[in-house]
């Protein structure tokens, strides 16, 4: 991503593809972040680095990075649901196996309530993930169709509707 001359905000950013074997780029610093460390976030400094424009000028942030973010957010939401399911399964198994005062601790109201709340949040997160993925899929399908042929006015309205829904729901799903 690179800012274009004469712009002051994210609307002026363009996206470029760069071959690191050509040199000219240094990593200034790596961000220290919480969560998944397999994909580092870093600040890059370019010095006479040759790159190819990716897509259209000044649409790097708005169109391309946001599309990448929506995909990444869905992936994070799916990981969250999977981890939550595993945690619930472990907690449930433990509550059934662990005995206290001659009975399984799942029979104690406080433990049962904790597991019920955990299951409710898990089911809500899964539903949010599936609905968000549905919105993204419909938007992408209409986007693909628009590259093949001109969309009807109704299809264009649907495309805008599902783009807004996808853009609204993906940050929610990520924060599950």
Stretch-by-stretch model annotation:
Residues 45, 70-176:
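Alpha-helical interface subdomain recognition
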Residues 9-14, 46-49, 74-78:
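Short C-terminal domain-edge/linker segments immediately following a structured domain
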Residues 1-25:
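A short core secondary-structure module
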Residues 19-28, 40-72, 89-107:
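A glycine-rich, basic-preceded beta-loop-alpha segment at the flavin cofactor/substrate interface
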Residues 15, 30-33:
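Gly/Lys-enriched N-terminal cap/neck module of very large, oligomeric protein machines
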Residues 7, 33-40:
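Short Gly/Pro-enriched turn/cap motifs at secondary-structure boundaries
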